[in-house]
Amino acid sequence: QRKKSATGYSFVMMIMVMLGCSVSAGAVTKNNADTEYQKGNYQQAIRDYEEILNNYGVSAEVYYNLGNAYYRTDNITKAVLNYERAHLLSPGDEDISFNLQFARSKTIDKITPESEMFFVTWWKALVNLTSVDCWAKTGIIAIIMALVLVLVYLFGSHIVLRKIGFFGGIFFVAVFLLSNLFAYQQRQMLINRTGAIIIAPSVNVKKTPAKTSVDLFLLHEGTRVDITDKAMKGWREIKVGDG
């Protein structure tokens, strides 16, 4: 009986291992997609990156690489779309920002963004210095450091150590609070995002939400707009970068 049980157990384990191997063999990895991209097989790389996103969820790096692959196939619209998605997840990444701006310069509509006060630009740059996850990790490290320094302040035997503990603790508490604030603001931007990319070759923007309404202007694929109202079914109120 024991032999039979052992044999049966081994047989089941072998099937499980074989199934695991077949799943692993069938799954596309980022390395596979990167290899296809490096070989110049951009269409295959696109399919692989999109499969990775479908199977494993969103990733700034994968969206960025997908944008690069689309750019290589002269699909500027899809390149802009995926750079925008990557930028949303990792707004502080300089490579993503550069490629996004470069791809935008290739679109038909040349729209200049509205100017804003210098301190608003500075604050946004600070908030977007890194990702939500990185701000969260910074906050955790900061609160741990603050607690350690509080203990140094409370139990330090020398006045110098106690001063370091006191002022260092205040500093890291401030870092903790700011990190959480920045993470919260970025998360709100992710949740309440209003940006959209026009995918159709061209779109007539109407004065009112009616097919018979006057055409105000024409927008082309790849142009970024902000949706300001979507209450009416089938229609969207938008705002373009220049107001």
Task: State what each model feature region is.
Residues K207-E221:
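SH3/SH3-like (including bacterial SH3b) beta-barrel domains
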Residues L219-G243:
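SH3/SH3-like beta-barrel superfamily modules
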Residues S115-F155:
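Membrane-embedded alpha-helical segments of integral membrane proteins
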